[in-house]
A protein has these predicted regions:
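Conserved hydrophobic/aromatic beta-strand scaffold that supports enzyme active sites
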Residues: 25-27, 37-39, 58, 78-80
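A short, N-terminal "cap"/entry segment at the start of jelly-roll beta-barrel domains
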Residues: 1-34
């Protein structure tokens, strides 16, 4: 597994497709059996429509702030969304840095 020592440096950031222009992500873990963990860097003026996922999603705001559902989520805020739960819309006026964790996909037989 690739190890990243400095999460805040400018290395290993990539354009986050499917998000507002200027959104960047740094993949910390991407494992089919263990899920995915990323740092998501929201630019000023970020916005995203409501959506859902087939796995649970967790947010921990490290820097900045975002708004969703009429509430503000500043640094230190945590949210968890269940599998299939619609969440959003999201916006960030000044940008934010968020730790995002998705649970692994589980196949039900």
């Amino acid at each position: 597994m690739k190890r990243i020592k400095n999460l805040y440096d400018e290395l290993n950031w990539e354009t986050a497709t499917g998000y507002s222009k200027g959104t960047k992500r740094k993949v910390l873990r991407d494992d089919d059996n263990k899920g995915q963990t990323i740092l998501l860097k929201l630019p000023e003026g970020f916005n995203m429509a409501p959506h859902s996922h087939i796995t649970a999603e967790q947010h921990f705001v490290l820097e900045g702030e975002y708004q969703s559902g009429g509430e503000s989520y500043p640094a230190g805020s945590y949210q968890i969304f269940s599998s299939g739960e619609e969440h959003g819309p999201f916006e960030s006026k000044k940008g934010a840095l968020i730790l995002v964790v998705w649970d692994p996909l589980q196949v039900v037989q």
